[in-house]
Amino acid sequence: MMRIKLFKYKANKFDMELDKIHYDEVAKLQANLSDEELKVQVATNGIQKFQKVVFDYYYECIGKNINSKMDVLELGAGMGRHSGVILDTGANLTVNDISASSLEVLKRTYPDIKNMVVSSMDQVPIEAKSYDVIVSCGSLSYADPNILDREIFRLLRNGGSLIILDSLNHNPIYKLNRVFKYFIKRRSKSSVKRIPDLDRIDRLSKYFNKSDIKFFGTYFWMITILGFFIGQDLANKTNILLEKYFPSSKNAFKFVLVCNEFNGHQE
């Protein structure tokens, strides 16, 4: 039996409650919108153009790795911005979030989703080995890394897959932006500290026979500035070319990780 050894990290339940309160408040504001208004706030609608390439690739990975015969869990689904892409595969989708208010908004947008679980991502009240694929978009930092990784491995069936889009924590410019969000109370201190790093990616990947990672956003920080001089459309095209021909993990902002053929076992 393979043993999973995870790094030490002290959880902060108070911060988790702060995050829940924040997203409950955001969801309650969204709940005032009409159904038509909610339905246009999905996928990449409203996302900055230079970031769309990341989400387009994430959606492509979902389409390639999920089919209608699979049971899929989306961790930290929030109000369902990206849930529709999974639903379109025909898979049996379960969505999870700590904010009940967020899932209520999601239900209005996607009434066909029947399985909703209100809980922390690191304590999902579901039987072990229930899912063929686990998906997460931008939510890894909202739970203790030790417990969350164990929970992912507990819930995933042998041979299963993991698809993650998230941010990286080693670019100083992006770090500064997250610290600013902490001071204006848009993020908790723990969620800033727990942004994934390359070591976290390695720990998640090692229990799968196959894994593939693609980095994005090395040049995001300069695109807005560049847009003032050459126009935003040309700046976006420049970003796409730079990402294509000069990809780099060193200063990347985001990553998409796809792991297949889970072979690990929880202790």
Please describe what each predicted stretch is.
Residues 147-158:
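A short glycine-rich, Lys/Arg-flanked "PGG" loop and its adjoining helix->strand segment in the class I
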Residues 192-209, 213:
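Short alpha-helix
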Residues 1-66, 69-78, 163-186:
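Conserved class I S-adenosyl-L-methionine
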